[in-house]
Regions:
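Metal-dependent nuclease catalytic regions and adjoining charged, substrate-binding loops involved
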Residues: 578, 601-605, 743, 878-973
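Metal-dependent nuclease catalytic cores in nucleic-acid-processing enzymes
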Residues: 505, 552-572, 862-896, 945
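Short beta-strand or tight-loop elements
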Residues: 268, 300, 493-498, 560, ...
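Adenylate-forming
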Residues: 164, 707, 793, 820-824, ...
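Non-catalytic protein-protein interaction segments used by genome-maintenance enzymes to assemble
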Residues: 807-882
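Short, contiguous acidic/charged loop-to-helix segments that flank catalytic cores in large enzymes
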Residues: 446, 465-468, 487-490, 547-553, ...
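Short, charged/polar surface micro-motifs in flexible loops or helix N-caps
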Residues: 40, 519-523, 813, 854-858, ...
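Polyanion-engaging groove/track-forming segments
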Residues: 1-742, 757-767, 774, 778-789, ...
Length: 974
């Protein structure tokens, strides 16, 4: 008997008519086929509203019908689950000679794409012999492995059911079939419908109007169903206007239509939202949702429809969670996206797959590890501070710092049975999180329990697979866990706004709907093709009835968008991102323009609402939450302080407003009594500290007093300088003994270079930081290039002074007794520091100080004074007053670049100090005058520090572009 087709536009009453006929046939045990499992309960409620009790019939998905037919035949095989099927494909790929595909097969996405392609081929009822090349070989190997294990996958079950229905009279007993919500039928589904229509009454509902561009993607399905119906076609007229607002009914008829329709008044039934960024768009939607909920609109009657739930999941959770909007996402969630699953997968990745330090601490930081959060922070901070990265070193050092082992790591690494290890770990994780005194209650706890149950089911599936197929590796278990999804969440929970994608929205009904993603690139979506089956191959296989060709992405999204616009009965909101988060403009989707074109321009403008990137707060009246009202109050305080104060007093927000407005004031002078007491008691100052204060007192306050530190160790200029100084110290202290000289010359240059190589190796071994091989090589080669050049330049130097003293500390307890008092600055203040090197006249008590610089630049005599560089002038006073040598000058020695030494030299000693820049030699009066001014500058700077005199005073009057401290000192930046 032929199939019956019910066709018509959206909301023409097709499904209602189908449900009525289903109820009329209850005495014949009818079967109603719906698209998704989540639709079963939704349709059940619709039927219960029509008839209080249903005493017959069933509501199934296509999979349910296929299973019923296949398993009733008696020859059915066990069906592999998704996880087992993925493991089977991994096994096939491991054994197959991939030839040209070997490079691609290394990546996990290769197996996933092959799985999808094999599913399409089986759904198209194709055999390996109908294909060619590597795909045919892989398909044949896959089928052979299934046969060897005496298993079916889901698609083979479908194929078997379709074949049984075509050949076995007992496969179906005359129950009428009703189906809706299927626009793209696979080969197996089409074979089932064909076979059923030959044996019983089959009624199919299809949204379709011939000739309308909105239904172009359904043309093939409609034509095939019409041919199968053989004239039994009911075309229903448009009826959306009977239940929906006039503007919505007008949109249904005019959207993507070739003929021109007279515009009707919008009257608020269609509204347009534009905002900057995904977060801004969702906050605009959230504000409107709150307003609707507060007016009494039931949350379950509102739907948020988006092209992809996955892409918007994170900003959606942030925006809706901040505003306190109850919502439910209709769709699958990967196990690794749940807190419980993320902790577990991270732990397995670290223990079994050589994961990173971050993977281990993702687990340890979770409530499921059983380790105190404070202890985790301490251990991770120390490991990051030493850049410990390799898994073994992370465990070794982490357990040493923690004082006890991490049991999960050892148990997983030593486990003989990966499944039992995961089962024990998950049970312990749940106990750690909840124990006996904190039973799992609340939404978060329910999610943890759902995840735990899903894991147990998966482990049971994997155990069955191991019994069938043999060994199961740790990699297999970890891969299965990462791919596992939780059972789909319902998006129609009472009291919650439903969040659905375009595909799931087809069978839903709302009073109010928000359609998101109406910017170019989001809708229509870019098409994707399989690397295994291109369009030409699909076209050729379709000639054999495989039904592998899919409509192009534009026509498909056009239909889905048309359907989404017909979901609401009262109001439709269209939402687009007018700009990115960084302000770059985004073009609207063509679908956005199509909707606006069916209404009057002025009407569209009236019902368009925009939120610009600069709109950091809502208006005070429209702020949806107290937090946003407080932010709006702070903005009001900038323009109307009196009004803001009055509002704050009326609502008890005075302290909050004061705290917010004080953030705009930038006082710098230190006033706290304890801080001033600490600074006032300070009598000794390091020379580099004074130089930093001279550069900018605010920068000094942040760097030297607050002293924030980066938690992650890096191979930076500071580390390079430390290693270079250490290597130079070792070199010059060992030179007299190992080279037999006090001064280098060209005759021993090669021996000196070899000694420097040994000293650098020792200095590198002393680095208390775990570096990667690349980092270690880069540091070694960069320093070796510079230090070798320094040694060779020393060998070529005409300087007759001999390097005698190195790393001379003064002004501290670790200094020599005669140097501990430091350099007297006057007013009871003294200077501390460390001189890198002193070169001495072998025939007299004279010398020069040398200060190594790891960079390329050295300060000239003029720059020393103009830029307030104090080291060389003050070090020369230390040389004279504490060391007891007459200073001939001081030099900065850059270790990189041209390595040209610059500094402050006495012109009277030009014969002794040859070869330096002419401008660095000063006459006696100028030389000692500059030195004395440096001492006075140091005294003044030290005095300012003691009184807490911190201001915004960057050298030159403007903050340098490279300074990154402005976020703390709060200096406005362009």
């Amino acid at each position: 008997m032929p199939l019956s087709l019910i066709a018509g536009p959206a909301n023409a009453g097709k499904v209602e008519l189908l449900l009525d006929r289903y109820l009329d046939a209850l005495d014949r045990e009818p079967v109603l086929i719906v698209p998704n499992r989540s639709d079963v309960e939704y349709v059940s409620r619709q039927l219960i509203r029509r008839r209080p009790a249903l005493l017959g019939g069933s509501i199934d998905t296509f999979d349910d019908v296929f299973e019923r037919i296949a398993f009733a035949g008696g020859a059915a095989r066990p069906v592999v689950s998704k996880a087992q099927r993925a493991l089977l494909v991994r096994r096939v790929l491991a054994a197959a000679p991939l030839d040209g595909l070997a490079a691609s097969a290394r990546f996990g996405g290769f197996a996933d794409e092959l799985l999808r392609t094999l599913g399409e081929l089986e759904s198209g009822l194709l055999d390996p012999g109908e294909l060619a090349g590597d795909l045919a070989a892989l398909y044949a190997a896959y089928r052979a492995e299934l046969d060897r294990l005496d298993l079916w996958d889901r698609d083979l079950l479908r194929r078997s059911a379709a074949e049984r229905l075509q050949s076995d009279l007992d496969a179906w007993h005359g129950e009428p079939v009703f189906a809706y919500g299927f626009e793209d039928l696979t080969g197996a589904e089409w074979a089932l419908l064909e076979a059923l229509s030959a044996r019983t009454d089959v009624s199919v509902s299809l949204p379709y109007e011939p000739g309308r561009p909105a239904f172009t993607s359904l043309r093939r399905t409609a034509e095939d169903l019409q041919r199968l119906a053989a004239g039994r076609i009911e075309e229903l007229p448009p009826r959306y206007s009977e239940v929906a607002q006039p503007a919505l009914a007008h949109l249904e008829r005019a959207l993507f239509a070739d003929e021109v329709h007279e515009p009707v008044a919008v009257d608020g039934a269609v509204r347009f939202f534009e905002a900057a960024g995904a977060r801004g768009a969702l906050e605009l939607v959230g504000e409107e949702l709150l307003a609707l909920l507060r007016t009494g609109v039931p949350a379950e009657s509102i739907g948020v429809i988006c092209p992809s739930v996955e892409r918007l999941r994170a900003p959606l959770e942030t925006a809706f969670g901040t505003l306190g909007i109850p919502y439910a996402v209709d769709g699958e969630v990967r196990l690794a996206q749940t807190p419980f699953g993320q902790a577990l997968v991270s732990m397995l990745r670290f223990a079994w797959l050589g994961g990173s330090r971050g993977d281990l601490f993702t687990f340890l930081r979770s409530p499921f590890s059983g380790v105190e959060r404070r202890a985790v922070d301490f251990v991770e901070g120390r490991l990051r501070g030493r850049a410990v990265q390799s898994p073994d070193r992370v465990v070794e050092e982490g357990e040493r710092l923690h004082g006890r082992p991490f049991p999960a790591v050892a148990e997983l690494r030593e486990a003989d049975d990966p499944l039992e290890a995961v089962r024990l770990l998950t049970a312990r994780m749940l106990r750690n999180a909840y124990g006996l005194e904190a039973p799992p209650v609340g939404e978060a706890s329910r999610l943890d329990l759902r995840t735990y149950e899903t894991l147990n089911r998966l482990l049971t599936e994997l155990e069955r697979w191991r019994k069938l197929a043999g060994e199961l590796s740790r990699d297999d278990v970890a891969s299965a866990l990462e791919r596992q999804t939780l059972r789909p969440l319902r998006g129609d929970e009472p009291g919650r706004v439903a969040v659905v994608d375009l595909l799931r929205a087809r069978t839903r009904r709302f009073d109010i709907a928000f359609v998101l993603g109406l910017e170019e690139g989001s809708l229509p979506r870019r098409g994707s093709s399989s690397p295994f089956l291109d369009d030409d191959a699909r076209r050729q296989l379709d000639e054999r009835g495989a039904r592998l060709q899919r409509p192009d992405s534009v026509s498909r999204d056009r239909y889905l968008f048309y359907t989404a616009c017909k979901r609401p009965l009262e109001r439709l909101y269209l939402v687009r991102e007018a700009a990115t988060d960084d302000g770059s403009p985004r073009e609207p989707s063509p679908f956005w323009d199509e909707v606006q074109a069916v209404f009057d321009v002025e009407d569209v403008r009236r019902w368009t609402r925009r939120r610009s990137l600069s709109a950091l707060t809502w208006s005070l009246d429209g702020a949806p939450t107290e937090r946003e009202r407080l932010r709006a109050l702070a903005e009001l305080a900038a323009n109307d302080p009196g009004g803001a104060d009055a509002l704050a007093r009326a609502n008890g927000w005075e302290r909050r407003l004061e705290r917010a407005t004080s953030a705009f004031r930038r006082p710098t002078k230190l006033t706290h009594a304890l801080v001033l007491e600490q600074l006032g008691a300070k009598a000794t100052f390091n020379v580099t500290e004074l130089e930093r204060f001279a550069d900018c007192s605010s920068a000094w306050f942040v760097e030297r007093f607050l002293s924030p530190r980066s938690i992650d160790a890096e191979v930076d200029a500071k580390l390079r300088g430390s290693v270079a100084h250490n290597a130079l110290y070792k070199f010059f202290t060992r030179m007299p003994k190992e080279l037999g000289v006090e001064q280098l010359d060209e005759r021993i240059a090669e021996d000196a270079v070899r000694l420097m190589r040994a000293c650098l190796d020792e200095a590198l071994q002393g680095v208390r930081m775990d570096m990667t091989e690349m980092q270690a090589r880069e540091l070694d080669q960069g320093l070796w290039r510079d230090l070798e050049a320094v040694v060779r330049s020393e060998c070529e130097s005409e300087l007759t002074l001999v390097p005698r003293r190195f790393e001379i500390l003064f002004g501290g307890e670790r200094a020599a007794p005669e140097l501990q008092r430091g350099l007297d600055l006057g007013d009871g203040l003294s200077l501390s520091g460390k001189i890198d090197r002193i070169d001495v006249d072998p025939f007299g008590a004279r010398g020069i100080v040398q200060d190594y610089k790891s960079g390329k630049h050295a300060h000239s005599a003029r720059e020393i004074e103009s830029e307030l560089r104090l080291q060389i002038p003050l070090y020369m006073l230390v040389l004279r007053d504490l060391v007891g040598l007459e200073p001939l000058g001081g030099l900065y020695r850059p270790l990189a670049g041209e390595r040209k030494a610059r500094g402050l030299l006495r012109a009277s000693e030009g014969e002794t100090l040859k070869g330096y820049s002419r401008n660095d030699y000063l006459e006696e009066e100028a030389f000692w005058g500059q030195v004395d001014r440096a001492r006075e500058t140091a005294r003044v700077l030290a005095g300012r520090i003691r009184t807490g005199d911190v201001v915004h005073d960057p050298k030159g009057g403007e903050c340098p572009a490279w300074c990154d401290l402005w976020t703390i000192c709060r200096v406005p930046r362009a």
